[in-house]
Amino acid sequence: MTHPPPFIAVIPARLASTRLPNKPLADLGGKPMVVRVAERAREAGAQQVLVASDAQSVLDAARDHGFEAVLTRADHPSGTDRLAEVAAAFGWRDDTVVVNVQGDEPLIDPVLVRDVASHLAAHPACAIATAAHPIHDAADVFNPNVVKVALDAQSVALYFSRAPIPWSRDAYQPHWPDVAAMPPPAFPVYRHIGLYAYRARFLRTYPSLAQAPIEQAEQLEQLRALWHGERIAVLITESAPEAGIDTPADLARVQALFQPGSK
């Protein structure tokens, strides 16, 4: 078995969620959600797992289950900003691989976490690695809530967008506006998976990077890195990961999976 390169997993966990308050502490089979996520990160082989939160109750929950936790500011606009604070505080070496494991994804595949970390380690010219999978439903291609990524020949990101990219002129133009009901074009359209591995060097510089106009227009923070000349390596997987928890309905669905006897 090939061992993955060393990496650190940081789980940003914000208590004040608009759609689902106290989400990190939601009970999943007798453990808080944030602990379930931390367990997945540990299964992925992270040499260090850190829960980063602005809420003492979240830190206490993590520590009660044996995980390291660090208090961060409450005014971070994104999880990446929270990671940047942690990277600055711990003083990790520039080439340290740090994976942002979302605190609301208790079903995330540990293999995917490990593979994204390994993908960044294998691409020294890139500051970030992430993942994507082929889209097989044209409705998803045209859904602005499904973020797409266009790649170069080395599977490095050219652009991320809520729009359908790449645009297949010959496939779509004659059939507009009924294209969302069509099969997707023969060439792959990739859906971005919101899992990131960063070099610590990039995280420390991130807060000083000005917001990009394309970032503000698309409301996609990864575009800030591209705007400022950083490279993002993209790992291609065959299928979508399990969805995260954003709503009470999502929570009920996942809680059912953690009930005794559930498969």
Curated annotation (Swiss-Prot):
Cited SUPFAM superfamilies: Nucleotide-diphospho-sugar transferases (SSF53448)
Top-level division of the source organism's lineage: Bacteria
Keywords: Cytoplasm, Lipopolysaccharide biosynthesis, Nucleotidyltransferase, Transferase
Pathway: Nucleotide-sugar biosynthesis; CMP-3-deoxy-D-manno-octulosonate biosynthesis; CMP-3-deoxy-D-manno-octulosonate from 3-deoxy-D-manno-octulosonate and CTP: step 1/1; Bacterial outer membrane biogenesis; lipopolysaccharide biosynthesis
Biological process annotations from GO: CMP-keto-3-deoxy-D-manno-octulosonic acid biosynthetic process; lipopolysaccharide biosynthetic process
Classification via InterPro entries: Cytidylyl_trans (IPR003329), KdsB (IPR004528), Nucleotide-diphossugar_trans (IPR029044)
Gene3D superfamilies (UniProt xref): Spore Coat Polysaccharide Biosynthesis Protein SpsA, Chain A (3.90.550.10)
UniProt family annotation: Belongs to the KdsB family.
Purpose of the protein: Activates KDO (a required 8-carbon sugar) for incorporation into bacterial lipopolysaccharide in Gram-negative bacteria.
Alphabetical list of PANTHER family matching this protein: 3-DEOXY-MANNO-OCTULOSONATE CYTIDYLYLTRANSFERASE, 3-DEOXY-MANNO-OCTULOSONATE CYTIDYLYLTRANSFERASE, MITOCHONDRIAL
Protein name: 3-deoxy-manno-octulosonate cytidylyltransferase
Organism: Burkholderia orbicola (strain MC0-3)
